[in-house]
């Protein structure tokens, strides 16, 4: 059975409907089955408007409505589908609705309007991505920097889309409009800044210890102990508001421009590998269909699950870690480096490069028994310098997170990524602004960490 069926054709200029995500079914190729490096060289056009599908995060979903009689590059049909460039990856169009185009690189469609394609030489290079935009509604893509020009497609809501450049142009009334230049099907298109929001980064939230208020006697004054009530409210807000929880591997793809992600996206991280996270966070995340990265101090994994004792910091056992892998992406928080020196400074600062590398490699060997893909590191107590960064790179990691506060933005250094702390005392309205694409960054200062 085909997923993409013939549907009522909606006029491109008045498209306002929404399209729900579709599940994986036989006949739809997975991302891994496509050769994403295969060049797209054939110019095509649609005979009628059609929905474009693409992987956004982990989901295959509708991403755009492609207007008819608009040229773009597409692959020859592979099975039931053509493949065209969409954002950082590819999209899929049902075969049978394309016809070969007979266009040159620049084709007149009106006396004063032109269709422009990325040149062959440009397609062979890493065309630079300037930034991302976020769609909050169904958004027209124009053939020129003018709302009177023809629409080539409708970009659907809740998408992050790469931007090639910005241009300011006056409209007929003399108002200055900021235009985003993008590429779809290796064709240049233009989106008005009035229709979208600039992407201000992906929030990576940090948690450590979770307790019920009634059992928290020893950690009331540590910022990194979160009440179960507040944590539940925060996770339920993310679910109800439609946020997709990302792996840090997807965050890396956002930075290296290799994946497409939704506009409402957040990454959850838990440092240390405490039993309270397994007791309270794991079942809630599992129920909500959410996932997180768990940074484990590998030398502190317990052979047996300890009897619950909320007055102390208890670490997860092998059994707890194994049984929670459906939610947690288990990564390294070091083996023996999670300590402070006599001056109360992270001990990583006083260790030589080879010592740090050996520690991280040992941690990776241990954690590969739980997760063979070891690629991310959380600096103990957030302590890092260039020597630590070089050691993380040398150990084979591809990214690392700090305790510096802020969102992850395009261009950020992958071995010094920022995160955010949400406190138990934060009203849910503040939490919403913290994770949202808010113009003013919301952070909590003076964080007191559990020792």
Go through the PLM ranges and name each one.
Residues 7-16:
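Bacterial N-terminal signal peptides
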């Amino acid at each position: 059975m085909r997923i993409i069926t013939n549907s009522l054709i909606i006029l491109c200029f008045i498209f306002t409907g929404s399209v729900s995500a579709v599940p994986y079914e036989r006949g739809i190729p997975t991302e891994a089955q496509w050769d994403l490096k295969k060049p797209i060289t054939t110019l095509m056009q649609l005979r009628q408007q059609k929905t474009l599908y693409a992987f956004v995060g982990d989901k295959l979903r509708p991403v755009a409505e492609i207007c008819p009689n608009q040229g773009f590059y597409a692959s020859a049909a592979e099975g039931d589908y053509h493949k065209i460039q969409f954002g950082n990856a590819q999209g899929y169009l049902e075969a049978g609705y394309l016809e070969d185009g007979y266009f040159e690189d620049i084709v007149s469609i009106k006396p004063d309007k032109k269709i422009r394609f990325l040149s062959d030489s440009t397609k062979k290079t890493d065309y630079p991505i300037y930034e991302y935009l976020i769609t909050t509604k169904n958004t027209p893509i124009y053939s020129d920097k003018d709302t009177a020009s023809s629409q080539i497609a409708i970009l659907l809501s809740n998408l992050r889309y790469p931007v090639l450049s910005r241009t300011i142009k006056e409209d007929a009334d003399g108002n200055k409009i900021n235009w985003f230049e993008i590429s779809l099907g290796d064709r240049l298109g233009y989106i008005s800044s009035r229709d979208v929001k600039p992407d201000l980064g992906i929030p990576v939230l940090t948690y450590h210890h979770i307790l019920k208020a009634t059992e928290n006697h020893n950690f009331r004054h540590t910022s990194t102990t979160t009440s179960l009530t507040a944590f539940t409210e925060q996770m339920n807000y993310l679910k109800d508001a439609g946020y997709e929880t990302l792996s840090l591997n997807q965050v890396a793809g956002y930075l290296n421009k290799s994946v497409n992600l939704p506009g409402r996206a957040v990454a959850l991280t838990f440092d240390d590998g405490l039993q309270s996270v397994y007791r309270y966070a794991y079942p809630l995340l599992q129920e909500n269909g959410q996932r997180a990265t768990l940074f484990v101090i590998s030398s502190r994994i317990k052979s047996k699950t300890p009897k619950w004792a909320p007055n102390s910091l208890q670490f997860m056992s092998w059994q707890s870690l194994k049984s929670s892998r459906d939610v947690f992406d288990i990564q390294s928080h070091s083996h023996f480096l999670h300590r402070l020196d006599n001056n109360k400074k992270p001990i990583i600062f006083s260790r030589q490069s080879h010592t740090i590398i050996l520690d991280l490699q040992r941690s990776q060997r241990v954690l590969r028994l739980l997760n063979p893909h070891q690629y991310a590191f959380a600096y103990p107590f957030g302590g890092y310098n260039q020597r630590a960064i070089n050691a993380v790179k040398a150990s084979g990691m591809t990214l690392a997170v700090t305790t510096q506060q802020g969102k992850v933005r395009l261009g950020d250094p992958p071995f010094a990524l920022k995160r955010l702390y949400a406190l138990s005392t934060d009203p849910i309205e503040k939490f919403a602004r913290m994770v949202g694409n808010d113009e003013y960054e919301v952070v909590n200062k003076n964080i007191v960490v559990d020792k």
